Amino acid sequence: MKIIEWVENKKIKKFKGEISGFDKESIKSVLEFHQSLPNYEKTPLIDLKELAKYCGVKKIWVKDESKRFGLNAFKVLGGSYSIGKCLSEILNEDISKLPFSVLTSKEIKKKLGDLTFITATDGNHGRGVAWMAKHLQQKSVVYMPKGSSQMRLKAIQDEGADASITDFNYDDAVRLANERAKENNWIMVQDTAWKGYEKIPLWIMQGYSTIMSEIIEELEKVKEKPTHVFLQAGVGSFAGAMQALLTKIYGKEEPITIICEPHGANCIYKSFKADDGNPHNVAGDLKTIMAGLACGEPNTISWEILRDYSNFALSCDDSISVKGMRVLSSPLGEDKRIISGESGAVGIGAFVSLYENQNNYKDFWQKLNINNESCILCISTEGDTDKDSYRNVVWNGHYENN
């Protein structure tokens, strides 16, 4: 298998004006809810001018989600909004009337009583759920797949969760959490969907939309827009949410989107490759350093969005993520340094690797049509959520599959 394998999506449809769940009012409601959270700030959209010159393109932007609410990752956006929506249903109130200050009030706690939220996670989503539950004075239970980082486990426990590492891969840890939720009448807050469980995953995806809302607002101020967007995918919830907004906002002028996954958990790539319009799973240990992308079963909601609107999927060796981590950690000239973790850096790693090795990917590079007018957008979805691992990769060149 090559360091990067690519496949073109042959099932793309023409956009007809709406993507269910991502209408203008829904997205506005999400952003307003997040703006009510303590210490809300837009995360930086960093213009890497020197890297753009090096790669022969007009612009390279990287959105740095390590700055999100002090949690070092973007996932709290989905966890917080979905829990807010859960509570709005329980309280029979529109979420617009339940900003954070109201949700965390003694009056609301009295109405709700004691609740427990449960989820499975590689780290970032579980930490976001635990953070929100703690602020609501509610309980959270978090299951992690085997091989998860002790540092990520401790970060979740520090948010007050009953968190533990299981003997299962990610997808089976999700099934375990779902069983426990049913047995104990807990609320399952999972960032992937399956038949019969779609409402909360959609709310989580809507929560992620704040990232792209912030990006588009900032780019509109300087009258710029991306031509190519590299989006990492695990189950596809993040990528699907970003794709939905790109398609909704830009319509016929939407950028080319490239979905990036690890070789060991490339379910979107394999689904594109099958070319039958259906999601296809990847079984086994899902071995990769990209822990946040180590998922083998596509989210059924996001799959339909990616199938209908995303242009390409890449299956990447772990060295591609490592490349991205190092590129962002050791910037050119006056470019700003970005601390990007294993799951955050694969997009920029893929782009730079393709540029530097375009002779090995002539057909793909030609299809991408990247030139000196191209504007590249990547989203670094996490910082150094496992500081020891990050340092070992960036300083020493060590990583598990090396």
Predicted segments, located by residue:
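PLP-dependent amino-acid enzyme catalytic core
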Residues: 1-402
